[in-house]
């Protein structure tokens, strides 16, 4: 009566028939294809590949940097691999029949070569420092400069594949990765980032002006001050006292130049000294005024620096009738005055008690001052032992009166030197060392005169 059926087989056959009619492709997928079965059976372990002609044979893959020249001839035999040529590479194990060509960095994209191509590695391209990669595809990228965040701060630094992320200051908004002033805000997007009105923008500008203006004024004042100090130190004649205060040193005075009148410093009483040991004045009245000790400062001549003391004239006009003699004749018992001993270094002069300046009168000191040339005076007092500080101090004390300053220097040397050493012989020795023998003779001639008084004061107009 119908087809005989095997128990348990009817139901699967019916289901298969139904599936074939409804889902033919799905049923076909349930049945293994002969080629797939062959591939599954011929799968090789890692590091090997199936022989293209005999799927049952597994050949060893070629190492990176090499390519497949010939397949292995049988199981357990080596594959014939060859090294890649220049300009080609293989970066992993393979069974390629030829190597891959090396890539080249694209200069139009600002790419630079990081490392060259080798047989086992492709060329590595990248960007310069402070640049990042902007990818246009999976492999194509362009190098762009990292943003410096002007008018803002760096929130995230620049990375290899990402630009700098900036955080803009108040009054600025971010547009195209740049912080732009809110003054240029024209659309609704930036207005959300710039809620400030025109008043706040003006406040921001006023804040900048408030900060910069004091700095400009401060640096301007500093520049003017240093310029003023430089001019004061350069042109000392303008303000001598200001120059002394600012520059920390005295105003230099040209030696030999006439100086304005200034009050000379007062010295204590000085006893009269005569370089002629045998001469002594008498008590008889004489019209020639005699020198008295100085007790208070008086006007002193300031323009005698270039005038030397000369010996008195050999002939003196006779006095008027009825007037007594100018100087009385010494008694017969009074010895005749002996001439002033020369300032020499002979044994006789050394043993004959050299004239000491400890008790010298101002006339003797003025004779030395007038005898030494002004251009050599500082050298003269330096040789006597005065320091630069003392010389400058005495110049300042006497204002611009050169002659009184020189007198003060000589008096200072006499004061600080012992009585035994402060002698005319020492001054003469210094003058000889300075090759000023003519000046030495002029001083000796001036000191031999009967009247050794300082010249009359002469006031500058």
From Swiss-Prot:
Membrane topology: Single-pass type I membrane protein
Organism, as annotated: Sus scrofa
GO molecular function, one term: tumor necrosis factor receptor activity
Pfam families named in the record: Death (PF00531), TNFR_c6 (PF00020)
Transmembrane parts of this sequence: 211-233
Written domain comment of the UniProt record: Both the cytoplasmic membrane-proximal region and the C-terminal region containing the death domain are involved in the interaction with TRPC4AP.
Protein name, per record: Tumor necrosis factor receptor superfamily member 1A
Region (N-SMase activation domain (NSD)): 340-350
Death domain: residues covered: 362-447
């Amino acid at each position: 009566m119908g087809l005989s059926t095997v128990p348990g087989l009817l139901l699967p056959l019916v289901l298969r028939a139904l599936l074939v009619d409804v889902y033919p492709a799905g049923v076909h997928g349930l049945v293994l294809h002969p080629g797939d079965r062959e591939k599954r059976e011929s799968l090789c372990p890692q590091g090997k590949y199936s022989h293209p002609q005999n799927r049952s044979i597994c050949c060893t893959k070629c190492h990176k940097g090499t390519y497949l020249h010939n397949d292995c001839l049988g199981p357990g035999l080596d594959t014939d691999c060859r090294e890649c040529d220049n300009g080609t590479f293989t970066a992993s194990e393979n069974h390629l029949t030829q190597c891959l060509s090396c890539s080249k960095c694209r200069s139009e994209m600002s790419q630079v070569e990081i490392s060259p191509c080798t047989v086992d590695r492709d060329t590595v391209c990248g960007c310069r420092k402070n640049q990042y990669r902007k990818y246009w595809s999976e492999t194509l990228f362009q190098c762009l400069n990292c943003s410096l965040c002007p008018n803002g701060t760096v929130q995230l630094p620049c990375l290899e594949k990402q630009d700098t992320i900036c955080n803009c200051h108040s009054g600025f908004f971010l547009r195209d990765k740049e912080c732009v002033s809110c003054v240029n805000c024209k659309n609704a997007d930036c207005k959300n980032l710039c809620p400030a009105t025109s008043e706040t923008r003006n406040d921001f500008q006023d804040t900048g002006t408030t900060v910069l203006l004091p700095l400009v004024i401060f640096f301007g004042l500093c520049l003017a001050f240093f310029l003023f100090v430089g001019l004061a130190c350069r042109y000392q004649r303008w303000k001598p006292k200001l120059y002394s205060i600012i520059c920390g040193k005295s105003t230099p005075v040209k030696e030999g130049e006439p100086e304005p009148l200034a009050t000379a410093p007062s010295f204590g009483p000085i006893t009269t000294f005569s370089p002629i040991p045998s001469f002594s004045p008498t008590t008889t009245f004489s019209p020639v005024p005699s020198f008295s000790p100085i007790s208070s400062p008086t006007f002193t001549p300031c323009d005698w620096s270039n005038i030397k003391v000369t010996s008195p004239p050999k002939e003196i006009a006779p006095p008027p009738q009825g007037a007594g003699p100018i100087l009385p004749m010494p008694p017969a018992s009074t010895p005749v005055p002996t001439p002033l001993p020369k300032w020499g270094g002979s044994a006789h002069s050394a043993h004959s008690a050299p004239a000491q300046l400890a008790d010298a009168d101002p006339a003797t000191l003025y004779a030395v001052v007038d005898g030494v040339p002004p251009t050599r005076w500082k050298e003269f007092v330096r040789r006597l032992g005065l320091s630069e500080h003392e010389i400058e101090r005495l110049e300042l004390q006497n204002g611009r009166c050169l002659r009184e300053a020189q007198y003060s220097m000589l008096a200072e040397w006499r004061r600080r030197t012992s009585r035994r050493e402060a002698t005319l012989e020492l001054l003469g020795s210094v003058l000889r060392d300075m090759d000023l023998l003519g000046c030495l003779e002029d001083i000796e001639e001036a000191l031999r005169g009967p009247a050794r008084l300082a010249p009359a004061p002469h006031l500058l107009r």
